[in-house]
């Protein structure tokens, strides 16, 4: 192709922008393959390279600054977008790129950026409408994550297996839910605050956080880790929708436990081994309110009773928890004789947490509570459920989340590469399986998508369907070659594979027939 055409082609494909006047001048001096390769490197070193190629990935990740459904409220998840851009500009290996997005929180000593990377699967829709069932839409989000993992990372339609075995490809109905089990134990629950979030403290509060971290540095590792995680994520905690069996009360707006005079609700199946304190965030507008907790049943033993301070805003309350072990139901009760016969709530509870032994001085504990109350910028991330509250995964008969079949354990489809015994049966193990060199689909899918971006059509034309009903590769050996290079020569670094393609004579030829 003429140089004028080729520089325009390169600039648009690599940076998403037309070439500048100086680029055109510099390219006119390119007279050898070596000069051409250096010019490609120069284009790929520009910040706009990451912005252009990140946009391709962000479409696959269904990135949006809103939550979807009828309200489509805003979502603050731009740090994930910026992380993707930075990853492409830094030429991060797709091994790490995928691992961080699927399981950054499960890496050893994860950094903030590793948590932010897990925003990949927090781009699911979130239903903020009052009266909806949070569990229904949590399940819908998990199903979306399963389908996206296969669409984006394998170029394979997996969604129809939700309802029945695949009619054309060797994927069984129960294998869908075995795969879903990898993704079914994260803390997100379709809550209005989109928890869990990573909290970003403002400049004026960072010193307060740093001072607290220094003060707890001498604590045992387990306690120190717990405190740091709670301040950073406000986890583990229980949201208001954990409560059920309301009497003279209700789940208000899906976000608060509201109990009137003599009202009650159940907190089911709480595990209290090692619990020393109950921490809850509440409001109580009317003076004279009393909170009471019974164990075992609505008529069970009273284990806690406290007169509440009057507050219209969310206030933190800590109560000493009685020695107990095992699992059982607990019941919240509300009393305020002044509200008898009235529709006013005695109190509202947003969330509660069961705290272990923390060994904090009074001053340090007050600082801990102050940091919890500090207003922060919050960004949705992935976090794993505590093991004591891990979910069971079931086959959904005909894809109906309400009709459970057999219980299943996390596994991958039998026709794919084997899941190695040294990998944990969680999202980190799944990420290892995806990027393993033995995976027949991942590298081919990436190479095919890169080719499509540069030529307008993939070697496999059906980008999302590498299955038996998708288009056959137009040049199968070429696709295999690019996948091999990507894995074994380039260590899955995207710039190297893109460079090989744009430096080829095929890419540089004239587009005229």
Locate the predicted segments by residue.
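Sequence context surrounding c-type heme c attachment/ligation sites in exported
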Residues: 106-210
């Amino acid at each position: 192709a003429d140089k004028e055409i080729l520089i325009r082609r390169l600039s648009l494909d690599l940076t998403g922008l037309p070439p500048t006047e100086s680029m055109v001048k510099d390219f006119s001096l390119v007279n050898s393959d070596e000069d051409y390769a250096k010019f490609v490197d120069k284009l790929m070193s520009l910040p706009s390279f990451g912005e252009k190629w990140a946009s391709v990935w962000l479409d696959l990740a269904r990135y949006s600054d809103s939550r979807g459904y009828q309200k489509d409220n805003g979502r603050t998840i731009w740090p994930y977008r910026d992380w993707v851009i930075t990853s492409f500009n830094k030429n991060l290996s797709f091994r790490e790129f995928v691992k961080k997005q699927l399981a950054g929180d499960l890496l050893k000593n994860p950094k903030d950026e590793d948590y932010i990377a897990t925003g990949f699967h927090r781009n699911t829709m979130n239903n903020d409408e009052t009266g909806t069932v949070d569990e229904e839409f949590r399940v819908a989000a998990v199903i979306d994550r399963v389908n996206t993992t296969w669409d984006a990372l394998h170029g394979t339609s997996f969604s129809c297996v939700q309802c029945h075995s695949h009619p054309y490809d060797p994927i069984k109905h129960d294998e869908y839910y075995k795969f879903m089990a990898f993704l079914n134990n994260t803390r997100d629950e379709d809550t209005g605050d989109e928890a869990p979030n990573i909290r970003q403290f403002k400049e004026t509060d960072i010193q307060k956080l740093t001072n607290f971290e220094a003060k707890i540095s001498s604590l045992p590792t387990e306690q120190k880790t717990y405190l740091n995680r709670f301040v950073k994520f406000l986890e583990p905690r229980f949201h208001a929708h954990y409560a059920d069996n309301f009497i003279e009360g209700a789940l208000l707006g899906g976000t608060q436990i509201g109990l009137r005079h003599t009202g009650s609700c159940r907190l089911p199946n709480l595990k209290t081994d090692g619990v020393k304190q109950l921490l809850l965030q509440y409001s109580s507008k009317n003076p004279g309110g009393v909170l009471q907790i019974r164990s075992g049943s609505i008529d069970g033993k009273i284990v806690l009773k406290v007169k509440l301070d009057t507050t219209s805003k969310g206030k933190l309350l800590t109560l000493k928890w009685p020695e107990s072990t095992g699992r059982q139901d607990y019941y919240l009760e509300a009393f305020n004789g002044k509200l008898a016969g009235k529709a006013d709530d005695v109190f509202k509870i947003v969330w509660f947490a069961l705290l272990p032994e923390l060994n904090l001085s009074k001053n340090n504990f007050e600082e801990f509570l102050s940091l919890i109350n500090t207003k922060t910028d919050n960004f949705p991330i992935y976090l794993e459920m505590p093991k004591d509250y891990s979910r069971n995964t079931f086959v959904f008969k005909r894809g109906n989340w309400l009709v459970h079949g057999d219980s299943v354990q996390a596994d991958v489809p039998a026709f794919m590469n084997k899941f190695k015994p040294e990998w944990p049966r969680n999202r980190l193990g799944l990420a290892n399986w995806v990027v393993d060199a033995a995976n027949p689909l991942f590298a081919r899918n990436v190479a095919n998508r890169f080719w499509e971006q540069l030529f307008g059509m993939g070697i496999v034309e059906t980008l999302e369907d590498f299955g038996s009903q998708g288009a056959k590769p137009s040049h199968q050996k070429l696709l295999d070659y690019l996948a091999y290079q990507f894995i074994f020569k380039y260590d899955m670094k995207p710039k190297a594979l893109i460079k090989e393609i744009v430096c080829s004579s095929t890419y540089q030829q004239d587009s005229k027939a």
